[in-house]
């Protein structure tokens, strides 16, 4: 959400709809979906737990959206904390992108996360190394790092990317 032009949080009137969740959830939020280079649901002002919203509601919402055939892709960006509800979301997903970095700590944290899920389906799980820098050691390839996964794609470090706008990032080689 950092790179979006409109970072205004989701409307407070939608919070109760996420707290309850029903068969009209997608219909209720559809008019609040924004469009920049892609369509997205605005971010929440605070964490969803602060609103007493179950993370499982996003699995439910994704299933509702998927049934409409309106979108080719439904992307749900989460933090790295694992929970049963995130496990359920992963189970329901057609594709799962796991983003890591090339340092030993990132390999360790990714391995810890993988200890909680079955990631044997190589068509479903894609591993991305973000902010890759060739001048630094790539511990993802070291036997000593005990990496439990193989990286499918490397996304090279982009100098000062935090100063770029979304439309500029979309033109960067390797991000298309």
Where are these regions (language model features)?
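Phosphate-binding loop that captures ATP/GTP phosphates
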Residues: 1-39
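Phosphate-binding/switch loop-helix module in NTP-utilizing enzymes
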Residues: 24-30, 35-85
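Conserved beta-strand segments of the P-loop GTPase G domain that flank and frequently precede/overlap
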Residues: 42-43, 75-77, 96-101, 125-131
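P-loop/Walker A phosphate-binding loop and immediately adjacent motor/lid segment at beta-alpha junctions
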Residues: 52-63, 111-135
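Inter-motif core of Ras-like GTPase G domains
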Residues: 83-103
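Short, acidic/turn-prone active-site loops that include or flank metal/cofactor-
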Residues: 100-106, 157-159
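Short, charged, surface-exposed secondary-structure boundary motifs
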Residues: 106-112, 162-165
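Beta-strand-loop-alpha "switch" segments that mediate conformational coupling across diverse proteins
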Residues: 131-137, 141-174
């Amino acid at each position: 959400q950092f790179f979006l032009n409109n970072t205004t949080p989701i409307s407070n009137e939608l919070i109760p709809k996420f707290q309850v969740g029903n068969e009209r959830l997608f219909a209720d939020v559809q008019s609040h979906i924004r469009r920049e280079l892609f369509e997205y649901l605005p971010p929440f002002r605070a964490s969803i737990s602060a609103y007493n919203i179950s993370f499982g509601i996003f699995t439910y919402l994704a299933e509702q959206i998927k049934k409409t055939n309106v979108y080719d892709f439904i992307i749900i960006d989460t933090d790295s904390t694992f929970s049963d509800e995130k496990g359920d979301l992963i189970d329901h997903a057609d594709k799962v992108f796991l983003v890591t970095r090339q340092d030993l700590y990132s390999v360790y944290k990714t391995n810890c996360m993988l200890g909680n899920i079955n990631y044997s389906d190589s068509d479903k799980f894609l591993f991305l190394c973000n902010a890759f820098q060739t001048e630094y050691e790539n511990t993802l390839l070291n036997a000593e790092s005990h990496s439990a996964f193989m990286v499918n794609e490397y996304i090279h470090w982009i100098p000062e990317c935090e100063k770029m706008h979304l439309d500029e990032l979309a033109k960067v080689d390797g991000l298309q």
